[in-house]
Amino acid sequence: GILVEDLLTLADRGEEVMVEGNAYDPVALLTLFVKRSLGLLGMHVPMAKIEAIMFTVEDLTPRMVDVLLRVAGGLSLEKANVSFQNHLESFYAYTLHQNKELYQNDVVVYEYNSALKMMCLSCNEHTTPKVVLIGQQEYEQMLRRVWSTEEETCKSQKEDLDELFDGIIKESLADRQVSTVFLIGDGFKEDWARESLRTLCRGRRVFQGNNLYSKGACYGMLERLSPSEKWKQYVYLGEDKLKSNVGMRALRNGQEAYFAVLDAGSSWYETSADYEVILESGDTVEFIITPLTGGKVMDRKVQLTGIPQRPRAATRLSVHLEMTSVNQANVTIEDLGFGELFPSSGKAWSSTITI
Protein backbone atom coordinates (compact mmCIF):
# COMPACT_ATOMS: atom_id res chain seq x y z
CA GLY A 1 0.00 0.00 0.00
CA ILE A 2 0.92 3.66 -0.35
CA LEU A 3 0.94 5.79 2.81
CA VAL A 4 -0.75 9.18 2.40
CA GLU A 5 -0.20 11.52 5.35
CA ASP A 6 -1.71 14.86 6.43
CA LEU A 7 -5.03 14.23 4.67
CA LEU A 8 -6.80 17.01 6.55
CA THR A 9 -4.15 19.56 5.54
CA LEU A 10 -4.26 18.38 1.92
CA ALA A 11 -8.06 18.61 1.87
CA ASP A 12 -7.92 22.11 3.36
CA ARG A 13 -5.50 23.20 0.63
CA GLY A 14 -7.49 21.44 -2.09
CA GLU A 15 -4.37 19.71 -3.39
CA GLU A 16 -4.81 16.56 -5.45
CA VAL A 17 -3.10 13.47 -4.05
CA MET A 18 -0.96 11.49 -6.48
CA VAL A 19 -0.89 7.74 -5.83
CA GLU A 20 0.95 5.55 -8.34
CA GLY A 21 0.43 8.13 -11.07
CA ASN A 22 -3.29 8.63 -10.39
CA ALA A 23 -4.79 11.87 -9.02
CA TYR A 24 -7.28 11.61 -6.14
CA ASP A 25 -9.54 14.19 -4.53
CA PRO A 26 -8.16 14.74 -0.98
CA VAL A 27 -11.69 15.28 0.41
CA ALA A 28 -12.77 11.91 -1.01
CA LEU A 29 -9.74 10.24 0.60
CA LEU A 30 -10.45 12.00 3.90
CA THR A 31 -14.07 10.84 3.74
CA LEU A 32 -12.90 7.28 3.15
CA PHE A 33 -10.49 7.53 6.09
CA VAL A 34 -13.24 8.78 8.43
CA LYS A 35 -15.67 6.14 7.19
CA ARG A 36 -13.11 3.36 7.78
CA SER A 37 -12.29 4.79 11.21
CA LEU A 38 -15.97 4.78 12.18
CA GLY A 39 -16.19 1.26 10.79
CA LEU A 40 -13.76 0.15 13.50
CA LEU A 41 -16.52 0.94 16.00
CA GLY A 42 -18.89 -1.40 14.17
CA MET A 43 -18.52 -4.19 16.73
CA HIS A 44 -19.80 -1.85 19.44
CA VAL A 45 -21.91 0.81 17.67
CA PRO A 46 -23.24 0.23 14.14
CA MET A 47 -23.05 3.39 12.00
CA ALA A 48 -26.83 3.29 11.59
CA LYS A 49 -27.15 3.90 15.34
CA ILE A 50 -24.86 6.93 15.48
CA GLU A 51 -27.09 9.75 16.66
CA ALA A 52 -24.55 12.56 16.41
CA ILE A 53 -20.94 13.16 15.45
CA MET A 54 -18.64 16.04 16.33
CA PHE A 55 -15.56 17.00 14.32
CA THR A 56 -12.88 19.03 16.10
CA VAL A 57 -9.99 20.62 14.22
CA GLU A 58 -7.39 23.24 15.04
CA ASP A 59 -8.91 26.06 12.98
CA LEU A 60 -12.45 26.25 11.58
CA THR A 61 -11.94 28.48 8.55
CA PRO A 62 -14.78 28.80 5.98
CA ARG A 63 -12.77 26.47 3.72
CA MET A 64 -12.39 23.89 6.52
CA VAL A 65 -16.12 24.06 7.30
CA ASP A 66 -16.83 23.33 3.62
CA VAL A 67 -14.42 20.37 3.67
CA LEU A 68 -16.01 18.90 6.79
CA LEU A 69 -19.52 19.37 5.40
CA ARG A 70 -18.48 17.41 2.31
CA VAL A 71 -16.95 14.69 4.49
CA ALA A 72 -20.11 14.52 6.61
CA GLY A 73 -22.22 14.32 3.46
CA GLY A 74 -20.24 11.31 2.33
CA LEU A 75 -20.86 9.44 5.58
CA SER A 76 -24.60 8.97 5.00
CA LEU A 77 -25.32 10.73 8.29
CA GLU A 78 -28.01 13.37 8.68
CA LYS A 79 -26.53 16.89 8.53
CA ALA A 80 -28.55 17.90 11.58
CA ASN A 81 -26.58 15.39 13.63
CA VAL A 82 -23.17 16.65 12.55
CA SER A 83 -21.40 19.52 14.32
CA PHE A 84 -17.98 21.14 14.27
CA GLN A 85 -15.87 22.95 16.82
CA ASN A 86 -12.26 24.03 16.94
CA HIS A 87 -9.72 22.86 19.50
CA LEU A 88 -10.25 25.92 21.69
CA GLU A 89 -13.96 25.16 22.06
CA SER A 90 -13.12 21.53 22.80
CA PHE A 91 -10.77 22.80 25.54
CA TYR A 92 -13.65 24.92 26.89
CA ALA A 93 -16.12 22.01 26.84
CA TYR A 94 -13.61 19.68 28.51
CA THR A 95 -12.87 22.23 31.24
CA LEU A 96 -16.52 22.82 32.07
CA HIS A 97 -16.98 19.09 32.60
CA GLN A 98 -14.30 18.96 35.31
CA ASN A 99 -14.75 19.63 39.02
CA LYS A 100 -15.19 23.34 39.74
CA GLU A 101 -11.99 23.41 41.81
CA LEU A 102 -10.00 22.76 38.63
CA TYR A 103 -11.23 25.97 37.00
CA GLN A 104 -11.66 28.12 40.09
CA ASN A 105 -9.06 30.40 38.49
CA ASP A 106 -7.49 30.37 35.02
CA VAL A 107 -6.80 27.09 33.21
CA VAL A 108 -3.77 26.70 30.93
CA VAL A 109 -2.94 24.23 28.17
CA TYR A 110 0.60 23.86 26.86
CA GLU A 111 0.47 22.03 23.53
CA TYR A 112 3.79 20.79 22.16
CA ASN A 113 3.79 19.20 18.73
CA SER A 114 5.86 21.15 16.19
CA ALA A 115 6.32 24.25 18.37
CA LEU A 116 5.04 25.14 21.83
CA LYS A 117 1.63 26.78 22.02
CA MET A 118 -0.06 28.08 25.16
CA MET A 119 -3.80 28.56 25.65
CA CYS A 120 -5.26 30.26 28.73
CA LEU A 121 -8.94 30.00 29.65
CA SER A 122 -10.32 32.74 31.88
CA CYS A 123 -13.85 33.39 33.09
CA ASN A 124 -15.67 36.55 34.14
CA GLU A 125 -17.88 35.31 36.98
CA HIS A 126 -19.55 38.72 37.39
CA THR A 127 -21.63 38.70 34.20
CA THR A 128 -24.83 36.85 33.31
CA PRO A 129 -24.16 34.55 31.61
CA LYS A 130 -20.56 34.10 32.73
CA VAL A 131 -18.26 35.00 29.84
CA VAL A 132 -15.34 32.67 29.01
CA LEU A 133 -12.40 33.80 26.87
CA ILE A 134 -9.36 31.84 25.70
CA GLY A 135 -6.11 33.59 24.80
CA GLN A 136 -3.31 32.03 22.75
CA GLN A 137 0.45 32.48 22.56
CA GLU A 138 2.98 30.64 20.38
CA TYR A 139 6.63 30.15 21.29
CA GLU A 140 8.51 29.60 18.03
CA GLN A 141 11.81 29.46 19.94
CA MET A 142 10.68 26.13 21.40
CA LEU A 143 10.58 23.98 18.27
CA ARG A 144 10.60 20.19 18.54
CA ARG A 145 14.13 18.86 18.84
CA VAL A 146 15.86 16.19 16.81
CA TRP A 147 17.70 14.28 19.50
CA SER A 148 21.32 13.34 19.03
CA THR A 149 22.22 9.66 19.04
CA GLU A 150 25.23 10.52 21.21
CA GLU A 151 24.24 10.10 24.85
CA GLU A 152 25.97 13.12 26.39
CA THR A 153 24.86 15.45 23.60
CA CYS A 154 21.28 14.22 23.92
CA LYS A 155 21.38 14.78 27.68
CA SER A 156 22.62 18.33 27.13
CA GLN A 157 19.86 18.97 24.56
CA LYS A 158 17.20 17.85 27.03
CA GLU A 159 18.62 20.01 29.81
CA ASP A 160 18.61 23.05 27.50
CA LEU A 161 15.00 22.40 26.48
CA ASP A 162 13.99 21.92 30.11
CA GLU A 163 15.59 25.25 31.01
CA LEU A 164 13.91 27.00 28.07
CA PHE A 165 10.47 25.68 29.03
CA ASP A 166 11.07 26.58 32.67
CA GLY A 167 11.70 30.18 31.65
CA ILE A 168 8.59 30.26 29.47
CA ILE A 169 6.47 28.94 32.36
CA LYS A 170 7.76 31.61 34.74
CA GLU A 171 7.19 34.35 32.17
CA SER A 172 3.76 33.23 30.93
CA LEU A 173 2.28 32.51 34.37
CA ALA A 174 3.88 35.39 36.27
CA ASP A 175 0.75 37.55 36.47
CA ARG A 176 -1.90 34.84 36.41
CA GLN A 177 -3.82 32.95 39.05
CA VAL A 178 -3.82 29.46 37.52
CA SER A 179 -5.66 26.50 39.06
CA THR A 180 -4.84 23.81 36.51
CA VAL A 181 -2.37 23.11 33.70
CA PHE A 182 -2.74 20.48 30.97
CA LEU A 183 0.27 19.25 28.99
CA ILE A 184 -0.66 17.76 25.62
CA GLY A 185 1.21 16.84 22.46
CA ASP A 186 3.85 14.30 21.50
CA GLY A 187 6.67 16.67 22.48
CA PHE A 188 5.92 16.12 26.16
CA LYS A 189 6.36 12.36 25.81
CA GLU A 190 10.11 12.61 25.28
CA ASP A 191 11.21 12.62 28.94
CA TRP A 192 13.06 15.93 29.10
CA ALA A 193 10.88 18.04 31.47
CA ARG A 194 12.42 17.94 34.96
CA GLU A 195 12.91 21.32 36.63
CA SER A 196 10.17 22.84 34.47
CA LEU A 197 7.66 20.33 35.86
CA ARG A 198 8.67 21.18 39.42
CA THR A 199 8.05 24.85 38.66
CA LEU A 200 4.72 24.06 37.02
CA CYS A 201 3.46 21.94 39.92
CA ARG A 202 3.97 24.59 42.60
CA GLY A 203 0.46 25.49 43.73
CA ARG A 204 -1.21 24.10 40.62
CA ARG A 205 -2.81 20.85 39.48
CA VAL A 206 -0.96 19.49 36.44
CA PHE A 207 -2.17 16.75 34.06
CA GLN A 208 -0.61 15.18 30.99
CA GLY A 209 -2.37 13.31 28.16
CA ASN A 210 -3.44 13.49 24.54
CA ASN A 211 -7.23 13.09 24.55
CA LEU A 212 -8.32 16.52 25.82
CA TYR A 213 -9.65 17.69 22.44
CA SER A 214 -11.42 14.43 21.61
CA LYS A 215 -13.09 14.26 25.03
CA GLY A 216 -13.98 17.94 24.74
CA ALA A 217 -15.59 17.24 21.36
CA CYS A 218 -17.78 14.55 22.94
CA TYR A 219 -18.76 16.81 25.83
CA GLY A 220 -19.52 19.62 23.38
CA MET A 221 -21.82 17.38 21.35
CA LEU A 222 -23.63 16.19 24.48
CA GLU A 223 -24.29 19.80 25.47
CA ARG A 224 -25.64 20.66 22.03
CA LEU A 225 -28.06 17.75 22.20
CA SER A 226 -29.14 18.37 25.78
CA PRO A 227 -27.61 21.42 27.52
CA SER A 228 -26.93 20.94 31.22
CA GLU A 229 -27.88 23.56 33.80
CA LYS A 230 -24.22 24.39 34.40
CA TRP A 231 -23.57 24.79 30.66
CA LYS A 232 -26.41 27.33 30.41
CA GLN A 233 -24.66 29.55 32.95
CA TYR A 234 -21.66 30.15 30.66
CA VAL A 235 -21.03 31.56 27.19
CA TYR A 236 -17.75 31.05 25.33
CA LEU A 237 -16.76 33.94 23.05
CA GLY A 238 -14.18 32.31 20.81
CA GLU A 239 -12.78 33.53 17.50
CA ASP A 240 -15.58 31.85 15.53
CA LYS A 241 -18.36 32.89 17.93
CA LEU A 242 -20.82 35.75 17.66
CA LYS A 243 -19.74 38.40 20.15
CA SER A 244 -23.11 40.17 20.15
CA ASN A 245 -26.78 39.40 20.55
CA VAL A 246 -28.90 40.37 17.54
CA GLY A 247 -32.54 41.30 18.02
CA MET A 248 -35.39 43.62 17.03
CA ARG A 249 -37.81 45.91 18.79
CA ALA A 250 -41.31 44.52 18.52
CA LEU A 251 -44.77 45.12 19.92
CA ARG A 252 -46.25 42.37 22.09
CA ASN A 253 -49.69 42.88 23.55
CA GLY A 254 -49.34 46.57 22.78
CA GLN A 255 -46.06 46.89 24.69
CA GLU A 256 -42.62 47.39 23.15
CA ALA A 257 -40.43 44.33 23.74
CA TYR A 258 -37.12 42.86 22.60
CA PHE A 259 -37.31 40.01 20.10
CA ALA A 260 -34.15 37.84 20.11
CA VAL A 261 -32.94 36.76 16.67
CA LEU A 262 -29.32 35.52 17.06
CA ASP A 263 -27.52 34.70 20.32
CA ALA A 264 -23.96 35.63 21.21
CA GLY A 265 -21.78 32.57 21.73
CA SER A 266 -23.20 30.73 18.71
CA SER A 267 -20.78 29.46 16.05
CA TRP A 268 -21.16 31.71 13.01
CA TYR A 269 -21.15 28.79 10.54
CA GLU A 270 -24.13 27.18 12.29
CA THR A 271 -26.14 30.34 12.87
CA SER A 272 -29.22 31.43 10.94
CA ALA A 273 -32.77 32.55 11.66
CA ASP A 274 -36.11 32.54 9.83
CA TYR A 275 -39.19 34.34 11.07
CA GLU A 276 -42.05 36.63 10.05
CA VAL A 277 -42.90 40.11 11.28
CA ILE A 278 -45.57 42.70 10.58
CA LEU A 279 -44.14 46.06 9.52
CA GLU A 280 -46.02 48.65 11.52
CA SER A 281 -44.98 51.61 9.36
CA GLY A 282 -42.17 53.03 7.26
CA ASP A 283 -39.84 51.30 4.82
CA THR A 284 -36.97 50.03 7.01
CA VAL A 285 -36.29 47.01 9.18
CA GLU A 286 -33.99 47.68 12.12
CA PHE A 287 -31.76 45.22 14.00
CA ILE A 288 -30.29 45.84 17.46
CA ILE A 289 -26.68 44.68 17.99
CA THR A 290 -25.77 44.25 21.68
CA PRO A 291 -22.11 43.29 22.34
CA LEU A 292 -21.49 40.94 25.27
CA THR A 293 -18.00 42.39 25.60
CA GLY A 294 -19.40 45.65 26.94
CA GLY A 295 -19.30 47.76 23.77
CA LYS A 296 -21.91 50.26 22.60
CA VAL A 297 -25.32 48.99 21.47
CA MET A 298 -25.71 49.61 17.72
CA ASP A 299 -28.55 49.70 15.19
CA ARG A 300 -28.38 48.21 11.70
CA LYS A 301 -31.07 49.22 9.18
CA VAL A 302 -32.18 47.47 5.99
CA GLN A 303 -33.92 49.77 3.51
CA LEU A 304 -36.98 48.30 1.78
CA THR A 305 -36.83 50.44 -1.35
CA GLY A 306 -40.05 50.43 -3.36
CA ILE A 307 -42.18 48.59 -0.80
CA PRO A 308 -45.90 49.12 -1.57
CA GLN A 309 -47.66 51.80 0.45
CA ARG A 310 -50.29 50.15 2.64
CA PRO A 311 -52.26 51.07 5.76
CA ARG A 312 -50.52 50.83 9.14
CA ALA A 313 -49.54 47.26 10.16
CA ALA A 314 -50.77 45.81 6.86
CA THR A 315 -47.46 44.41 5.56
CA ARG A 316 -46.20 40.98 6.54
CA LEU A 317 -42.50 40.29 5.96
CA SER A 318 -40.47 37.09 5.82
CA VAL A 319 -36.97 37.60 7.27
CA HIS A 320 -33.98 35.30 6.79
CA LEU A 321 -30.60 35.94 8.46
CA GLU A 322 -27.55 33.81 7.79
CA MET A 323 -24.03 34.45 9.07
CA THR A 324 -21.36 34.51 6.35
CA SER A 325 -18.46 35.19 8.72
CA VAL A 326 -17.97 35.80 12.42
CA ASN A 327 -19.03 39.46 12.07
CA GLN A 328 -21.22 39.61 8.96
CA ALA A 329 -24.70 38.37 8.13
CA ASN A 330 -26.73 38.26 4.95
CA VAL A 331 -30.30 39.50 5.41
CA THR A 332 -33.06 38.57 2.95
CA ILE A 333 -36.51 40.12 3.40
CA GLU A 334 -39.58 39.26 1.31
CA ASP A 335 -42.92 41.06 1.08
CA LEU A 336 -45.69 38.58 1.92
CA GLY A 337 -48.51 41.09 1.66
CA PHE A 338 -51.43 40.83 4.07
CA GLY A 339 -54.00 38.24 3.13
CA GLU A 340 -56.41 38.78 0.22
CA LEU A 341 -56.75 42.50 0.90
CA PHE A 342 -53.10 43.24 0.14
CA PRO A 343 -51.49 40.47 -1.92
CA SER A 344 -47.70 40.07 -2.01
CA SER A 345 -45.84 42.34 -4.41
CA GLY A 346 -43.21 39.64 -4.92
CA LYS A 347 -40.50 42.11 -3.94
CA ALA A 348 -37.43 40.98 -2.00
CA TRP A 349 -34.46 42.84 -0.54
CA SER A 350 -31.00 41.57 0.33
CA SER A 351 -28.37 43.29 2.43
CA THR A 352 -25.22 42.52 4.41
CA ILE A 353 -25.00 43.82 7.97
CA THR A 354 -21.99 43.99 10.26
CA ILE A 355 -22.44 42.49 13.70
Positions of PLM-derived features:
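Acidic, glycine/GT-rich loop-and beta-edge segments that sit at the periphery of enzyme/chaperone cores
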Residues: 219-306, 316
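Active-site neighborhood for divalent-cation/phosphate handling
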Residues: 28-96, 210
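Early-domain small/polar-rich strand-loop-helix modules and first-structured segments
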Residues: 1-16, 73, 81-85, 90-93, ...
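Short glycine-rich, Thr/Ser-proximal phosphate-binding strand/loop in the N-terminal lobe
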Residues: 1-3, 122-158, 341-355
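Glycine-rich phosphate-binding loops at beta-strand->alpha-helix junctions
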Residues: 53-65, 168-198, 209
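Gly/Thr-rich phosphate-binding beta-strand-loop-beta motif of the actin/hexokinase/Hsp70
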Residues: 1, 95-138, 315-336
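Conserved phosphate-binding catalytic cores of ATP/NTP-utilizing and phosphoryl-transfer enzymes
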Residues: 77-109, 212-230, 311
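Conserved phosphate-binding loops in N-terminal lobes of ATP-dependent enzymes
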Residues: 1-56, 142-166
